[in-house]
């Protein structure tokens, strides 16, 4: 009888724990994805802060030339970064216990792999937590779908690209200048600016910014005033009110006259779907572009594609970009190889016709 009561008590305790985890009455929703997300993101954040402040230099290229990334080793906020795991490690799983010592683990850039893997799993759990909370509240699942765009982008630069290139040392450094270096080298090796998927991403980001500004300014300019001229129009709004807070007909009329009638949405649902879908689809395409360029399916190459009747090259902007790419290619990792890949396999292309 005692054993039976004990089992009931433990089951009741577990049941209360489950109810607390999945309760939507908590100030911050936890959820089952949150049970995984919280320790993963705390680990990634803690290791990032410690390594950014105090990690010793990392032999990123595997040639015994360590690169400093932390504040205590001479960097500032702009130049500092978590330096990617060494090329000597490649794609091997490199936890602390796989190294002979902590010094070796730090020298080979172990913190980068630790941060990236915990971070990627953590943001995937955050996306799952968004879906889980939407499900509990009876909402539709599109918040998590929208968040999948930045998750896909992060996964592309931190995981898919290193897999395609064969080493975590090719992943994006976790710092400002390191990110710029990653972008420049990526352009040199893959001609990303000439890749149509990157162009779609640019249209998504800049177009999304434009549409967000247009929508916010139109709504703010067509608020229904419930107050006098002597107090803020915002004071006339009550959270949860049934009445609409702005006049969509007025906003539609304004924008329809500013551009033309059919350039303006007259359906709020269609408008907000468009505002969400435009940047999300653009960033999806950019992530897909990074993931294909990871395996060296690169941007368009129009070098020396225009010639005169005598066969002489007439330079275009594509040739100017190619010249810049060659310059960036020969300057990066200049001690890691005798010749850049573009120049070592065949005769260098002419850049002046």
From Swiss-Prot:
Site entry: Tyrosine radical intermediate: 161
Catalysed reaction, written as an equation: 2 a plastoquinone + 4 hnu + 2 H2O = 2 a plastoquinol + O2
Keywords noted in UniProt: Acetylation, Calcium, Chlorophyll, Chloroplast, Chromophore, Electron transport, Herbicide resistance, Iron, Magnesium, Manganese, Membrane, Metal-binding, Oxidoreductase, Phosphoprotein, Photosynthesis, Photosystem II, Plastid, Thylakoid, Transmembrane, Transmembrane helix, Transport
GO MF terms, alphabetically ordered: chlorophyll binding; electron transporter, transferring electrons within the cyclic electron transport pathway of photosynthesis activity; iron ion binding; oxidoreductase activity, acting on diphenols and related substances as donors, oxygen as acceptor; oxygen evolving activity
UniProt xrefs under SUPFAM superfamilies: Bacterial photosystem II reaction centre, L and M subunits
Membrane topology: Multi-pass membrane protein
Residues that coordinate or bind Fe cation: 215, 272
Cofactor: binding details: The D1/D2 heterodimer binds P680, chlorophylls that are the primary electron donor of PSII, and subsequent electron acceptors. It shares a non-heme iron and each subunit binds pheophytin, quinone, additional chlorophylls, carotenoids and lipids. D1 provides most of the ligands for the Mn4-Ca-O5 cluster of the oxygen-evolving complex (OEC). There is also a Cl(-1) ion associated with D1 and D2, which is required for oxygen evolution. The PSII complex binds additional chlorophylls, carotenoids and specific lipids.
N-acetylthreonine PTM sites in chain numbering: 2
Stated role: Photosystem II (PSII) is a light-driven water:plastoquinone oxidoreductase that uses light energy to abstract electrons from H(2)O, generating O(2) and a proton gradient subsequently used for ATP formation. It consists of a core antenna complex that captures photons, and an electron transfer chain that converts photonic excitation into a charge separation. The D1/D2 (PsbA/PsbD) reaction center heterodimer binds P680, the primary electron donor of PSII as well as several subsequent electron acceptors.
Protein known as: Photosystem II protein D1
Organism: Chlorokybus atmophyticus
């Amino acid at each position: 009888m005692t054993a039976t009561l004990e089992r009931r008590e433990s089951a009741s305790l577990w049941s209360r724990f489950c109810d607390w985890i999945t309760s939507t009455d908590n100030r911050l929703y936890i959820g089952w994805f949150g049970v995984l997300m919280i320790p993963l993101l705390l680990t990634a954040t803690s290791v990032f802060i410690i390594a950014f402040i105090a990690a010793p230099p990392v032999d990123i290229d595997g040639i015994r030339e360590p690169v400093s990334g932390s504040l205590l080793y001479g960097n500032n906020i702009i130049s500092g970064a978590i330096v990617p795991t060494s090329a000597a490690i490649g794609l091997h799983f490199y936890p602390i216990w796989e190294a002979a010592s902590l010094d070796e683990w730090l020298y080979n850039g172990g913190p980068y792999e630790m941060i990236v893997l915990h971070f990627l799993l953590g943001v995937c759990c955050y996306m799952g937590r968004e879906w889980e909370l939407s499900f509990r509240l009876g909402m539709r699942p599109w918040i998590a779908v929208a968040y999948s765009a930045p998750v896909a982008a992060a996964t592309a630069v931190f995981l898919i690209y290193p897999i395609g290139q064969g080493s975590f040392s090719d992943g994006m450094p976790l710092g400002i200048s390191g990110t710029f270096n990653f972008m420049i080298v990526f352009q040199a090796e893959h001609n990303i600016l000439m890749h149509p998927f990157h162009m779609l991403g640019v249209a998504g980001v800049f177009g999304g910014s434009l549409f967000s500004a247009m929508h916010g300014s139109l709504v703010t300019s067509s608020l229904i005033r419930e107050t006098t001229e002597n107090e803020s129009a915002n004071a006339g709004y009550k959270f949860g009110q049934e009445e609409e807070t702005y006049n969509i007909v007025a906003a539609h009329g304004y924008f329809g006259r500013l551009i033309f009638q059919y350039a303006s949405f007259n359906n709020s649902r269609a408008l907000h779907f468009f505002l969400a879908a435009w940047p999300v689809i653009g960033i999806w395409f950019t992530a897909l572009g990074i993931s294909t360029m990871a395996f060296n399916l690169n941007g368009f190459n129009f070098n020396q594609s225009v010639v005169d009747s005598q066969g002489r090259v007439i330079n275009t902007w594509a040739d100017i970009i190619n010249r810049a790419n060659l310059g960036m290619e020969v300057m990066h990792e200049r001690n890691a190889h005798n010749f850049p890949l573009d120049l070592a396999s065949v005769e260098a292309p002419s850049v002046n016709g």
